[in-house]
UniProtKB/Swiss-Prot annotation:
Gene3D superfamilies: Cyclophilin-like (2.40.100.10), Tetratricopeptide repeat domain (1.25.40.10)
Name the record gives this protein: Peptidyl-prolyl cis-trans isomerase D
TPR-type repeats, residues: 219-252, 270-303, 308-341
Enzyme class: isomerase
Length: 371
């Protein structure tokens, strides 16, 4: 059978943000799917608990958002997770637990224990196997995944999981059986610098974390954009792109790479932080320089030349924040890896001069205090 489809039109803080399209597993959980479809359609009468409130998701909000877990909605009576109602009455039984919570973007019933399904449901943002056997999975998001991620990232009110800005279902309904998701529905918009990758690899339709070549391509592409911007002296843009590459690397944990691919990934763990360091120096973001260079010094793939660069750049950062002792320590250590480097030698001389000036300034200050 053709699985039925429904949609939510979403606004955040009153601004329209787009549409989420769901496909319902009516062939597996017909009663649960029918409940959702009827609540999207909004033609099943009024709520028994509040006779002036329609049985409809329209006008309701996503009242609970937990990053790296799920986003919850469906309380159209109380708007806080304490209400809602099914088309069958206040609650209905768990239909079955056949489908597992094994991926993001699944649609699953929220409940307060066994056989307490109503109208509240949630969309998974990651696999949630601990919910298997407790919550009924009855559909999935087939369009609007970027919007789901946007909702997931909403800032919440202090001490709660409620978004600070209302995430509202402005409209909802059913789609025809022959509806097809547009080919470019999940395509990431290209920014003005040519970057069309999401901020996170797991959110990007172009990247398959099980295929290392797609990860490498993502890192290389964004890194090249950063280098182009650096050459054009757009240092802050370059820094942002290099940091994006660094984020890609830190969220990628392969366990079965061949030697060649592992070398590429490990090399990135040296070149990307070094690029961050030089762009951050140009941007006067000295904290980022120190963090990036420290990562290089601990990287397995860092050779003597890379360590010299890291120590040199970190030394310059310390120099610029007037910590001449730390600057000299790094710069002198850099000479053990690159003994005849003119730039390092100059930086050492500049730092010695600066420290001497600081010492003389302190002496004058003390003489005025006690003179």
């Amino acid at each position: 059978m053709t699985r039925p489809k429904a949609y939510f039109d979403i606004s955040i803080g009153g601004t329209p943000k787009g549409r989420i399209v769901f496909e319902l597993y009516k062939d597996v959980v017909p009663k649960t799917a029918e409940n959702f479809l009827k609540l999207c359609e909004g033609k099943s009468g009024m709520a028994k608990s509040k006779p002036d409130v329609p049985l409809s998701y329209k006008g309701s909000i996503f009242h609970r958002v937990i990053k790296d877990f799920m986003i919850q909605f469906g309380d159209f009576t109380n708007f806080d997770g304490t209400g809602g109602e099914s088309i069958y009455g206040e609650k209905f039984e768990d239909e079955n637990f056949e489908i597992k919570h094994d991926k993001p973007f699944l649609l699953s019933m929220a409940n307060a224990g066994p056989n307490t399904n109503g109208s509240q449901a949630f969309i998974t943002c990651v696999p949630t196997p601990h919910l298997d056997g407790k919550h009924v999975v009855f559909g999935e998001v087939i369009e609007g995944k970027r919007l789901v991620r946007l909702i997931e990232k909403q800032q919440t009110e202090d001490g709660t999981d409620k978004p600070m800005h209302d995430v509202k279902v402005e409209g909802c309904g059913l789609l025809p059986d022959d509806y097809e998701v547009p080919a470019d529905a999940e395509q990431t918009p290209t920014d003005e610098f040519g970057d069309n990758y999401e901020e996170s690899l797991k959110d990007d339709a172009k990247v398959d974390l099980k295929k290392v070549e797609t990860v490498i391509k993502a890192i290389e592409t964004v890194k090249d954009i950063g280098t182009k911007q650096f050459k054009e002296q757009n240092y802050e843009v370059a820094l942002a792109k290099y940091k994006k590459c660094d984020k890609f690397l830190k969220e990628y944990f392969p366990d079965d790479l061949n030697e060649e691919d592992m070398k590429k990934i490990n090399d990135f763990k040296v070149t990307v932080p070094l690029n961050i360091a030089i762009a951050a120096l140009k941007s006067k973001d000295y904290r980022s320089v120190m963090v990036a260079c420290s990562e290089v010094l601990y990287a397995e793939a860092a050779d003597a030349k890379a360590k010299a660069k890291a120590l040199y750049r970190r030394g310059l950062a310390y120099y610029h924040v007037n910590d001449t002792d730390m600057a000299l320590a790094d710069l002198e250590m850099a000479t053990t890896f690159q003994p005849n480097d003119a730039a390092i030698a100059k930086a050492i001389n500049d730092t010695i001069k600066k420290r001497k000036q600081e010492t003389e300034k302190q002496k004058k200050s003390l003489s005025k205090m006690f003179g």
